[in-house]
């Protein structure tokens, strides 16, 4: 049995020590960069529209055409989806460590290249931006399954959830840093190159130097990724991959002897026995019987969660404008608009996003993944309905702060809820040789949801009145009806959570069935051994 391997028992029972925190920082900085890169584009899209699609005859500032806006906002998600599938599969074939370095260098190169452009025409700049952001997303996609898998395989079973959640929580700091960098850059440029509002001077409201501002914001994301490359390459391969997949238990024991500072002598025969017994593939009947409903649960929950999460997150600036929390665009210069959009996103990250992530870190190994995910979907539904039902009340003068508070609570329960748990659980419940692949499939389903949100919300949230839509967009269903739709997505996630097992306090081998003989596995998982919700107290 896998559970008889001394090296895995040593990892499961290890006390929390320095190498755990080192792994959190190394893996977490990748997610810091991921979040910074994916969300920073929403801070500069209005500026891009003013610079490259300026029309002197228009009463409103230039904006990205619908197809260009959809491409700029969504192309990184397309790359991320492809990267999650490809690097997730590759991580199980080549090893976590080897592939980890590839993804990071791809992120660094494409992050820097995102700020470059071929020519100065709108078409040339947008084509360059979309090309490099696709490949940036491809690298980011690999970071999802690999970071989660590496952290889960390094962690002890008592605090594994908190460690994986801490890696994911670095996204919150990535969002916050993106807003802060954009605030500093826009404020510095505005102080040096001040400009009048658009309605006072249409051409003069966007100074030529503003073209550098968005490039600096996007390129800054390469710095934290570059700083962690050396340390990623120094990490040894995870013991679970080396012993259970590469079938070299002695090397796994040697690696973990250095990490844990204890002497571990492993018997190769035990690892060979596990490898002989655990040979079924992803598309086999045995995988379907053991893990089919689990994979369905993780993919559907992540898919519907990301529809709601990314459609709201990417277009915060449009929602703020709708409730008049931001001034009208023609009353601001280009850099002033960038500053105020960045300030709004920074406040939401600080008040609604970061606290939710760290609540998950502190409570996930106490109350479990199931309760947090179920509760998160429930409260997201409640708060979105609370925004949608009295939507006209929230958009009247004097009620805007209440809207923002409700919106912040929605994000709090997304992050102290399914946005964290959908990342954590797939790294725990699948066999070692398929763990990275299954996490990549689950994450790719999430990014498919993000694509639906980021492309579809551009059109769906448009006013039903054709005279009030953004330039180039057909009438949509409006923000209010969009919020009803997103609440419905959360309801679906609530019910599919019941397909996902509770993983608190169990070893990875116990959860994946690698401790069981094939003959011991029932056709349908029993209630006692594969309980979805925690058992009630006796």
UniProtKB/Swiss-Prot annotation:
It comes from Oryza sativa subsp. indica. It is found in: Membrane. The gene is PHT1-4. PROSITE patterns: MFS (PS50850). InterPro entries: MFS_dom (IPR020846), MFS_sugar_transport-like (IPR005828), MFS_trans_sf (IPR036259), Phos_permease (IPR004738). The chain crosses the membrane at residues 24-44, 70-90, 99-119, 124-144, 164-184, 211-231, 295-315, 347-367, 370-390, 397-417, 441-461, 482-502. Disulfide bonds: none annotated. This is Probable inorganic phosphate transporter 1-4. SUPFAM superfamilies: MFS general substrate transporter (SSF103473).
């Amino acid at each position: 049995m896998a559970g008889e391997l001394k090296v895995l028992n040593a990892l499961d029972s290890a006390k929390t020590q320095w190498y755990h925190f080192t792994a959190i920082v190394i893996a977490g900085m990748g997610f810091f960069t991921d979040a910074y890169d994916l969300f920073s584009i929403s801070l500069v899209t209005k500026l891009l529209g003013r610079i490259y699609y300026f029309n002197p005859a228009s009463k409103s500032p230039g904006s990205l055409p619908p197809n260009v806006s959809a491409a700029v906002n969504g192309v990184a998600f397309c790359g991320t989806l492809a990267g999650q599938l490809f690097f997730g599969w590759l991580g199980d074939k080549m090893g976590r460590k080897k592939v980890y370095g590839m993804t990071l260098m791809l992120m660094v190169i494409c992050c820097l290249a995102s700020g470059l452009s071929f020519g100065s025409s709108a078409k040339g700049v947008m084509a360059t931006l979309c090309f490099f952001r696709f490949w940036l997303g491809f690298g980011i996609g690999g970071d999802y399954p690999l970071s989660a898998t590496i952290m889960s395989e390094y962690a002890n079973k008592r605090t594994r959830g908190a460690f994986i959640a801490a890696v994911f929580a670095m996204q919150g700091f990535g969002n916050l840093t993106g807003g802060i960098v954009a605030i500093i850059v826009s404020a510095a440029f505005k102080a040096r190159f001040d400009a009048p509002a658009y309605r006072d001077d249409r051409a003069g409201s966007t100074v030529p130097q503003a073209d550098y501002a968005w490039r600096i914001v996007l390129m800054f994301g390469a710095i934290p990724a570059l700083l962690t490359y050396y340390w990623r390459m120094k990490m040894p391969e995870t013991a679970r991959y080396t012993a259970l997949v590469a079938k070299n238990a002695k090397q796994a024991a040697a690696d973990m002897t250095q990490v844990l500072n204890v002497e571990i002598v492993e018997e190769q025969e035990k690892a060979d026995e596990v490898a002989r017994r655990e040979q079924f593939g992803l598309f086999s009947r045995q995988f379907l019987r053991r893990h089919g409903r689990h994979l369905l649960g993780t993919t559907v929950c992540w898919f519907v969660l990301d529809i709601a999460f990314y459609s709201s997150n990417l277009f915060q600036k449009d929602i703020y404008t709708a409730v008049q929390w931001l001034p009208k665009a023609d009353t601001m210069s280009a850099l002033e608009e960038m500053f105020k959009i960045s300030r709004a996103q920074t406040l939401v990250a600080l008040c609604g996003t970061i606290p939710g992530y760290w609540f998950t870190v502190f409570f996930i190994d106490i109350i479990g993944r199931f309760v947090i995910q179920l509760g998160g979907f429930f409260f997201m539904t409640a708060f979105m309905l609370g925004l949608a039902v009295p939507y006209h009340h929230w958009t009247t003068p004097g009620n805007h702060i209440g809207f923002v508070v409700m919106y912040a609570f929605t994000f709090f329960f997304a992050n102290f809820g399914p946005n964290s748990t959908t990342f954590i659980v797939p790294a725990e419940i699948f066999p070692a040789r398929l763990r990275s692949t299954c996490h990549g499939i689950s994450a790719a389903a999430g990014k498919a949801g993000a694509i639906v949100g980021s492309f579809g919300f551009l059109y769906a949230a448009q006013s039903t009145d054709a005279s009030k839509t953004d330039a180039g967009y057909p009438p949509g269903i409006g923000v209010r009806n969009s919020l009803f739709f997103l609440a419905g997505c959360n309801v679906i996630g609530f019910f599919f959570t019941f397909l996902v097992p509770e993983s608190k306090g169990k070893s990875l081998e116990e959860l994946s069935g690698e401790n069981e003989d094939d003959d011991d596995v029932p056709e349908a998982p029993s209630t006692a051994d594969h309980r979805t919700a925690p058992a009630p107290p006796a």
